[in-house]
Amino acid sequence: MKLRFLTIIAALMVLAPLEVDAQRGHIRPSHPHIGDRYTFFRGIGVTFGYVNSQYYTQDKATDDRISSDLMNGFTIGLTKDFALLPHALYFQTGLNYIYQNDSRNENIKIPLTDMSVRIVGDREEHHLGIPLRLKYDVHILDNIGLTFDAGPTLLMGLSSKYLYKTRLSEGMVTSVDYNLYNGKVKSNGNQSGDFNLEQWMDDKGMYPKGRLGRFDVMLGASVGAHFFHILEVRLGYDYGLLNRYRNDVADMYSMHRGQFTLSAGKRF
């Protein structure tokens, strides 16, 4: 139901400016440089960039706040601008794919033994985002302009997992796959011998206090520059408005996501 609701909102916000733009008849300005800017913002944008994000968990009773390890990754997507005020104000939407990862690689000494094990693990996340932004353009020089945008991005999580494995001895490999959305754990190998990988992950606080929701509404802003009516670079920050915890845990704790993005794009 929630997915249908978000899809309807996105569709309405995309179609509304499209209809307004169509009614204007695509009138091109007479000034040559302004005309180039008009063409630039009417094109389809292909963007690729670096993403750095972090989760913030807060205890509602004590206000204690814990920040997760930083996650790095990339984003790739398509954008489209629709003119609201000619050559100045635009509505931007599109579809972005976001991948991020936090790797861990360390040696652990097994208590009461002379043995040590090497643990290799990742936290991986995949998201889809639909930006719904207002974008303002400032003309600086003939071939250079600045843009400022702000607004929400509808975010849907495709996957969020911990993937850890270790080798206790030759031929004895254990692994744990934990799904943060449904709370399911898949274990392979011996988890009850000298070293229990699943218990180690629990002791390290890797399992969240409850399952996480897939959906978020990220509110943010960015500043950018475009060059020669073709290339565009942007730097922005977004913060999640929804508590990612679900069910009863959401009454005691809140988890929100912050994200920096540095991207470059080209319009066609």
Go through each PLM region and give its residues.
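Short sequence motifs at beta-strands and strand-loop junctions characteristic
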Residues: Y38, S68-G73, D122-H127, K209-D216, ...
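Gram-negative outer-membrane beta-barrel proteins
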Residues: N52-K60, Y99-N107, D122, I140, ...
